[in-house]
Amino acid sequence: KKNIYSILNKQFGFDSFRGEQEAIIKRTVVEQKHSLVLMPTGSGKSLCYQIPALYFDNCTIVISPLIALMQDQVDVLKKKNISAAFINSTISKPEKEKRLKEFVEGKIKLLYVTPERFRKTDFVEQIKKAKIDLLAVDEAHCISEWGHDFRPDYSRIGEFRELMGNPLTIALTATATHDIQEDI
């Protein structure tokens, strides 16, 4: 039977959780509650959505602001034999279509995209067909107009969530003042 501890150990090679990871992951997989996670850089925020992504039966969308960050995360996951991919402007149209099709078919467990990807009608039409259990919003401070690197499409994540059938959502950031937290 799948459990968060065996996923932590078998997929990621760790014997125990760090800091608040365990409580956050349990809130997601056991209580099935939305979360806003504030954890310092380097404290293992990514595991807080990656473990639930592997625990749940269906797929996870990860909204991330930086193409380089996406690529790094996907590379790390692939080295651990986890089916992950990204769709962004660095790849060809046929490759984007292939990855999107595989995601909709459930062959890709985690799909990393920028919020701007939701401007693309063909992407949105396909995403509506996918079975999505979890939406992870990385660098969630970008949602807030109070944030130093505000991205307008981040403020539309509520709309994007609806298109996906309102999946369980976890938003993560290392930097969020009280105003930014309220905004998110």
Regions from the PLM with identified roles:
Residues 58-80, 91, 95, 114-117, ...:
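Conserved Walker A/P-loop ATP-binding site and its immediately adjacent core
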Residues 50, 91-134, 143-148:
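Conserved helix/coil segment N-terminal to the catalytic DExD/H
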Residues 31-37, 58-60, 107-109, 167-168:
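Pre-Walker A (Motif I) flank of P-loop NTPase domains
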Residues 1-40:
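Conserved pre-motif I regulatory segment
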Residues 30, 53-55, 77-79, 101-106, ...:
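Conserved catalytic network of the ASCE P-loop NTPase/AAA+ motor domain
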Residues 128-184:
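Post-DEXD/H (motif II) to motif III coupling segment of the RecA-like Helicase ATP-binding lobe
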Residues 32-51, 61-66, 173:
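Walker A/P-loop
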